[in-house]
Amino acid sequence: MQLRWSHALVHVTAMDAMVVFYTNVLGFEVTDRGDVGGNEFVFLSQVEPDHHQLGFSATREQRGRSNNVAHFAFRVDDLDAVKTMHEVLTQDERVTNIMPITHGNAWSVYFNDPESNGIEIFCDTPWHVAQPQGGPWDPTMATDDIITATRSAFEGASEFGPINDYYDERTSHLEQREGGQT
């Protein structure tokens, strides 16, 4: 199974300054933003059709050990690959904090590597859903049952729709943006 780099979630202290820097200096666009549990999240991308290459969470502590990167994410081809990885991880005693989470637009397994670095293995669902949001899912369920349960859990959520429609909208938006540059 091939792992493809996807995104990083970074803990920040000055959200507005970080967003301004990454949008104005590095050319990212904000694709979503919102609060979960009183913590602000902002998602940014400059690559079609990715929802985000970077995520910022306003949760960085002022002192202590390095604490700015929440996790590194790797995309796999499909839900069965995520389920297989979950099975492998649960059998490895070096791996801790295994958490299967679906965000409606992805099935993810989060975990800590042997040095407690956060890792995410995920694949896209067939849907786009406004972010941030999420809930647990059971990788031991049959694949069709997981798909049905996920659709049921998120079909009433904001911006719920086919992922390919979202990809087309992102692609069109970025093409228009690039066409307007001199």
PLM regions with names:
Residues 9, 32, 48, 60, ...:
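Short, flexible loop/turn elements at secondary-structure junctions
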Residues 3, 13-16, 72-118, 123-130, ...:
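Vicinal oxygen chelate
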Residues 1, 12-14, 40-42, 58-62, ...:
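Residue-level detector of functional hotspots within protein domains
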Residues 2, 10-51, 180:
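Core segments of cupin and vicinal oxygen chelate
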Residues 5-7, 67-72:
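Eukaryotic phosphotyrosine signaling hubs
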Residues 22, 63-66, 86:
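A short alpha-helix capping/helix-coil boundary motif
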